[in-house]
């Protein structure tokens, strides 16, 4: 990693892989992504997209906190702690369907408890994670607590504020800065305790297992891609099977195949076009979330596109498809820049693809499902072909080489 404070390490006894407990925990991610995608079915408006973005980021944050806890704890992980977090996330997933009616409070309360449980797990271990500053700087949780006394738009705005604070902390507080804060805090406590009194023990900086974390992040992207496949299959099973449906189905499958390749074969940590070890973990996690959220939104759009094999795709669905792929490509472009590809190389990689996506969203008002999907395939295929021709020496984490 690029921070001066050690943040990751390789396992001494050989490479770790996801445990049965971690894979069981990921079942909540399967359920949560499926429920969240349903927020975007039909003809979603901007308010639907905004609510989806906030809830997806909250759900992903809960998953990430316990994923990092399992990564650091290894064989010392407390099973019941993970299962309790799993139950809290299951409540969050179950609350999605009625979030606009009477379940928003349940979603917020479950999120608060999941965050509190994760914080307690680190306190019990006597450790903190330099690359995960929100475990020590929990200001972003305050708006969620306050939201319990509000309803509707005000409540969602408070959720968004809390998540914005967390993102700001992740981007702005380095591992070195967090370590200095912890040292200063416990030095102050020692002075306040006075002579002859025992001060609270300072938590130790925990090291993450980098290859194992890369595998876990990649598995989450596979879960999201799997949800996209499920959406298309479910929609196709209820549609009339004809040439137009075959074109939509084949195009959707090829599009997801291209995204799988860009994220897991030509990326690192599930982030497309990212090279291993160029960014600290705290800067890898947010784009991982953005990519996963974009693919899950794309999944909802692909499921809806199947219904328009003989009619123009409505504007909201068209923009959902184009916008989600646009976000994916934009994150890929940032990752390519951070990976040393340079501005000209990055523009060549994602510039034409983004142009196709934006023009399609703005101009393809009469495009039917098959035409729209295959335009998106062309956009993703360009990036895939260029990256294959300009492949750098190192593509991703060792743990993902077989993906």
Where are these regions (language model features)?
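Predominantly late transmembrane helices and immediately cytosolic-facing juxtamembrane segments
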Residues: 2-19, 23, 28, 32, ...
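Short, flexible active-site-proximal loops enriched in glycine and acidic residues
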Residues: 81
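Transmembrane helix-boundary motif of multi-pass solute transporters/channels
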Residues: 27-47
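Short catalytic helix/loop segments, enriched in acidic residues and glycine
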Residues: 50
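Signature aromatic-anchored transmembrane alpha helix within multi-pass, membrane-resident enzymes
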Residues: 373-374
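Membrane-helix boundary connector in multi-pass membrane proteins
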Residues: 359-370
